[in-house]
Every structure is written in C-alpha cells, then in structure tokens.
Regions:
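Tubulin/FtsZ superfamily GTPase core signature
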Residues: 1-165
Length: 165
C-alpha cells in the first residue's frame, strides 16, 4: 500500500489546518475545516477547504461541535466521499474548534465507514504557559478521544516543540 496515495489528512481548526497544509504541499490528499474565514486565508487556494458557516471558532464552547457538523452538510458530505483507507485528523486540543470537532468527526467517520477505514488522531497539546481554559479544553478533548472505539493510533504533538508559521 502506497501511504501517500492511501492517506487523507484532515485539519480541524486553525492549528490543524496549518499543519495539514504542510502535508498538502508534499502531495498528500487533504481537507481543511474551520469556522474562521481569517484563519482559512493562510491556506491560499488549497483544494478541500470547508468554511464552517456560523462557527467562527466555538468561543470555548466545544459542545457546539455536533451542531456545527449538522449545520455544515457540505463538510459531512465530503467526509462521506473519502476514498483513502487511512484518515488522519490533526487538531489542537487547547482551542475550541479543533478540540470540539475532533471526537465528533472521528465518530462520524467511524459511523459512516465502520472498520473499512483506519482512523488516526494527532492532537496538538497547548504550551505550558497558555491559559488554564486551554488546558481544561485539552483534558476534555483527550477524555473524549479515549472514550472512542475504533481509533487505531494517536500521536500527540507538543506545541512547545512544534512551531508552525
């Protein structure tokens, strides 16, 4: 199996989209989902950009993720058309869009494809000096991630040692 050809990388939220752009530049199949039009501008004319209408960040309210997914049918339809065998979700757990959407999107993919896809998550941890609410979001997001069945692998990135400009 050729890894690049059989992998779809999905960036959720600003951090996830920035990292996913690096993979797009290397020729991987990618999708980007964020509610902030300003954040999406840094992606330029990449293919697979999904503006989550009505959700310019979740303002720390991660529970809005399911509502967001239901309100953005274009994104869910794109998730239902993924041909690649491996799906990698990249997102920051300290924010709200990526951390809120991560478990919901992973579960949605699992519900659509069952065991036919390999789901891998790549959560980016906040820096030590970030606000306490970012660490609270991280804890909640990781708890949700741990409760999901069907995630084949998780690779944590330390934001302290991984700067993406």
């Amino acid at each position: 199996m050729e890894i690049k050809k059989n992998t779809m990388i999905i960036g959720l939220g600003n951090c996830g989209c920035k990292i996913t752009k690096l993979f797009a530049d290397m020729g991987y199949s990618t999708m980007f989902a964020n509610g902030s039009e300003q954040d999406l501008k840094v992606l330029g004319n990449m293919k697979g950009i999904y503006k989550l209408d009505g959700y310019d960040g979740f303002g720390g309210h991660r529970e809005r993720a399911m509502e967001c997914l239901c309100d953005n049918v274009e994104f869910t339809e794109a998730l239902e058309k993924i041909e690649q065998k491996i799906i990698i979700l990249i997102y920051a757990v300290g924010g709200s869009t990526g951390s809120g959407l991560s478990a919901v999107v992973a579960q949605y993919i699992k519900d659509v494809y069952g065991e036919n896809k390999i789901i891998v998550t790549v959560p980016v941890l906040p820096k030590e000096n970030e606000a306490i609410n970012r660490h609270k979001n991280s804890y909640q997001a990781v708890q949700e991630l741990m409760s999901l069945d069907g995630i084949r692998a998780t690779f944590f990135l330390d934001n302290k040692n991984c700067e993406v400009t």
